[in-house]
Amino acid sequence: TKTVEGINVGKDMYELMKEIVLPKELSVGEGYGTVEWAIRSIFEGYTGWFRHNSTTELYSYSPKSIFPELNDLIDKEMALKMVKDLIEKNEYLKAIHISEIIISSDNNKEALKMYLKIHQILLKESQKNSNRWIVKWLEFEIEKTKNKLNEEADSTT
């Protein structure tokens, strides 16, 4: 009901995902799913997939498709410093977004290292709630990033 109440007063999905928590007496753990995912599912079930945020949502155009162009526009050193600062402020998800832009067209080694570090931190933190999906995804991303770093090292030798 909290999700529907939020929808009815105009809150967006991400806002509700941050705000809503289960009362302790209803919490049974999040080993298979999360409260955030349930909120997202309810939100999209009621409102549909179109979030009214951008015209591009109506077309088959991935937001990530512009990452290479953004990467060409940015100062890499400033962007890498921003990622490092975000990590230090524990703003890991923002740091992932910026890292993905930097990595999108040239697999920047420093950005890959920071991307790896972020995922390792998130994996360590996720062990507390032991959500299987999150743990497995983070392990997958860590392995994939290590492989990219190893490929980069192999190509320079």
Stretch-by-stretch model annotation:
Residues T1-T157:
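Accessory terminal helices/loops
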